[in-house]
Amino acid sequence: VPALQWGLSAAIETVHWTASFDFPDVQHDYTFVALHHDDEYAMNEGRIVSSRGLDIPPGQFLHHFAERQVPHSTALHAVLRDTGQTYLVGPLARLALNHAQLRPQARALAAAYGLDRPCFNPYRSIVARAIEVVQAYEEALDIVQHYRPPAEPRVRYTPRAGHGAAATEAPRGLLYHDYAVDADGRLASARIIPPTSQNQAQIERDLWQLAQRLLPTDDARLATACEQAVRNYDPCISCSTHFLKVHIERG
C-alpha cells in the first residue's frame, strides 16, 4: 500500500506537470467512441457509446463499424458504417464520455484542467493519459485495501461450439475481440480490431490538415510537426521514435 500511495502522489504531480505544457491551439471535430459503464470508469466491461449518441452492446460492434482497404496503404481504415467518417478512441474519448465515473482525485484533476468536458485538441491527450494514471492508482488502492479472495480461482466450463464478442479499453483505446469455437472448444475463427488501427484513418486525416497548414515552413519543421501529431495518438507502429519519412514536392 505505501508504494501505491507514493505512486498516486507522483501521478498527481505528473498531471500538474503535463498540464503546464505549451500546447498548439488545434481543434478537430472528433466523434469520440469508448466503452461506458454507469457504475465505474469502464475498462473491462460496459457498452460501446459515442459522442453522437451511439449506445450498443459489444456484440453489435461490426454492425456499426467497418474496416476498409484504401489504395494508398496496407493498413485497414476503421470508419462508422452509417457515415463512412473517422472516429477517435483513446484517453480523450474516454474522459469525454466517462469523466463522471472517475475516482475523486482523478475527477477533480479533470475538472481543474478542463477535461471534465470534451476536449478536441489532440495535443492535450498527454494530460488525459496522466489523469488516467491517477485513476489507475486510485483503483489499485481500492482493490488492495478491499480485496477478498474468490471462492474459486477460475470459472469451470465444458467445451462446446459457440461465438462470442467483447470489448475492453486498452491504454490506446477501444479493443474489440470476436471469436468462434467448434464443438471441441478449438478456435474456428478470430478477429481483433485494436485501437491503433481504429485511429489510423483519423491520424492520416490530422496529418493531411497539418501538412496543408505548415507547407510554407521549412522541410525539417514540417517533418517534426508531423511526427508530433502522430505521437498524440500513441500508435504502436511508432513506438514514439523518429520514424516518419516525409517526401515534399514544392511547385
Q: Where do the language-model regions lie?
A:
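Short beta-strand elements
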Residues: 166, 175-194
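Active-site bordering "gate/hinge" segments
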Residues: 1-172, 194-251
